[in-house]
Amino acid sequence: MKVRASVKKICSDCKVYKRNGVVRVSCKVKKHKQRQG
């Protein structure tokens, strides 16, 4: 999980979604997992 100020899709499989007001990126490539914070 990377914590970043700016979350972006890294590849076409990445999905951006919001959970409890926190923007997150989920992907089948575990390296691409991100959270805004």
From Swiss-Prot:
Any one Gene Ontology molecular-function term assigned to this protein's record: structural constituent of ribosome
Domain of life, source organism: Bacteria
GO biological process: translation
Pfam families reported in the protein's UniProt record: Ribosomal_L36
Record keywords: Ribonucleoprotein, Ribosomal protein
A single cellular component GO annotation: ribosome
InterPro entries: Ribosomal_bL36, Ribosomal_bL36_sp
Keyword Ribosomal protein: yes
Similarity annotation: Belongs to the bacterial ribosomal protein bL36 family.
PANTHER family listed in its UniProt record: 50S RIBOSOMAL PROTEIN L36, CHLOROPLASTIC (PTHR42888), LARGE RIBOSOMAL SUBUNIT PROTEIN BL36C (PTHR42888:SF1)
UniProt-recorded name of the protein: Large ribosomal subunit protein bL36
Taxonomic classification: Bacteria, Pseudomonadati, Thermodesulfobacteriota, Desulfobulbia, Desulfobulbales
Gene: rpmJ
